């Protein structure tokens, strides 16, 4: 908002969000597959998904998710010992702090799914990759983030009573696998007019 008003800045960020989401997913898939076409396709699906399209109607904090694939990329590189401990801890800490500032919901979801993925791979790939080192370094990063975010946690705890009881309807902002094939209300051309 230094150069433009809030509305213009918001619109620019809404235009950048899908492209940055797609690019981050492209980097992750390109690293995993070494196939540019597959990475392009996956980046497109991630960056311009119905989830992003529906949240661009008013939830920029939920539509801006490029840090999620970047956190996963950093974790995979650490598990494969392609990045040092200090670099991993510092990078993951910065990414988590940024994601906390953007959206705590996305961070909590990423942490939960990351833990499920970790335990899945721990039992299937623990001999081929450094799962214990990844867990230790992630724990150190989590402690660092907790210390740095302790003032925010304090005020979140104080404001817990002010959370409204009602939950928004999932009709508009819901996500399902059919959304890629059958357009939802938010992705259908013309929206509610048709």
Language-model features: locations:
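Juxtamembrane segments of multi-pass membrane glycosylation machinery
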Residues: 1-13
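Juxtamembrane loop-helix boundary motifs flanking transmembrane segments in multi-pass membrane proteins
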Residues: 4, 48, 86-90, 126-131, ...
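Alpha-helix initiation and N-capping motif
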Residues: 6, 38-41, 72, 116, ...
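Residue-level signature of transmembrane alpha-helix interfaces in integral membrane proteins
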Residues: 65, 119-121, 133, 165, ...
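Transmembrane helix-loop junctions in multipass membrane proteins, especially transporters and channels
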Residues: 81-82, 122-130, 149, 153, ...
């Amino acid at each position: 908002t230094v150069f433009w008003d809030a509305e213009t800045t918001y619109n620019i960020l809404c235009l950048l969000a899908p492209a940055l989401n797609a690019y981050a997913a492209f980097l992750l898939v390109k690293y995993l597959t070494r196939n540019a076409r597959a990475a392009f396709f996956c980046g497109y699906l991630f960056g311009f998904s119905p989830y992003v399209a529906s949240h661009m109607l008013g939830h920029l904090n939920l539509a801006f998710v490029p840090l999620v694939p970047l956190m996963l990329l950093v974790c995979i590189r650490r598990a494969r010992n392609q990045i040092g401990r200090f670099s991993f801890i510092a990078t993951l800490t910065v990414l988590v702090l940024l994601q906390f500032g953007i959206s705590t919901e996305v961070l909590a979801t990423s942490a939960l799914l990351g833990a499920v993925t970790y335990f899945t791979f721990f039992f299937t790939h623990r001999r081929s990759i450094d799962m214990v080192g990844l867990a230790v370094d992630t724990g150190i990063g989590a402690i660092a983030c907790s210390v740095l975010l302790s003032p925010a946690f304090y005020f979140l705890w104080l404001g817990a009573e002010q959370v409204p009881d009602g939950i928004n309807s999932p009709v508009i902002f819901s996500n399902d696998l059919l959304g890629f094939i059958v357009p939802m209300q938010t992705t259908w051309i013309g929206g509610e007019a048709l």
